Amino acid sequence: VTSYAYPATELAARAALDYTVQALNYFSKQFGMPPRGSLSIVQADFPDGMEYDGLFFLSDRFYYGFDGSPRSYLALIAVHETAHQWWYGRVGSDQAMEPWLDEALCTYSELLFYESLNPELADWWWGFRVEPHAPKGSLSATIYDFSRFTPYRNLVYLRGAQFLHALRQTMGDAAFFNALQTYLARFDGQIATRSDFLDAVQQATSKDLSASIADAFKP
């Protein structure tokens, strides 16, 4: 793993590297190896984060605003973009017509990371990342339904994470993680769809998930 950053932000760059390595190790244990043997983190004059195969950008504002704490966008987005090496890099999806599929998985993967490595911050994650934005709407939305980023993020990323959490609460942890592993193994190197994901989820449990699914995708 290589971290590319401006000299003035060396402390934050090292932190971004540390969070990324921790996330790589955690996700590798949960989901298997990432698609590439290397990963580059690049500080960029960019508004947020952006994933690529074996590479991601982090906004320079995350570096300049970093206070040394895991309660930060630098940590959150480093973990999020690392998760894309699985939910994008290994299992693809239609990022225009079904943008929630990889983004919700990566957003929820942030929580999984914090639960594992900093469990005392799980409640903080919900209170900082999701709840203040009161996400709502149907996950059937496409990118063409949005003219601004904030409503898009609130629905696709945050409402999507709430949906995954609802599934997990109904299924239980063992079935939920089994569903994620099945989904990844079944569609590794392919473009998956909502139906593919929901099939893997439903096959992992005998619990009735119809209410959560209907609520998430209601017109």
Where in the sequence are the language-model features?
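Juxtacatalytic substrate-recognition/specificity segment
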Residues: 1-85, 89-98, 150
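Amphipathic alpha-helical substructures
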Residues: 9, 121, 153-219
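Extended, well-ordered alpha-helical scaffold segments
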Residues: 15, 19, 40, 123-129, ...
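Extracytoplasmic/secreted envelope proteins and their assembly/folding machinery
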Residues: 17, 21-24, 55, 79-80, ...
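Active-site-proximal structural scaffolding
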Residues: 20, 51, 71, 75, ...
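Sec/Tat-exported extracytoplasmic proteins
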Residues: 28-31, 81-82, 86, 90, ...
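Surface-exposed patches in mature extracellular/periplasmic domains of secreted proteins
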Residues: 33-42, 94-98, 120-124, 178-179, ...
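Acidic/His/Gly-enriched intrinsically disordered linker/tail segments
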Residues: 99, 103-171, 187, 216-217
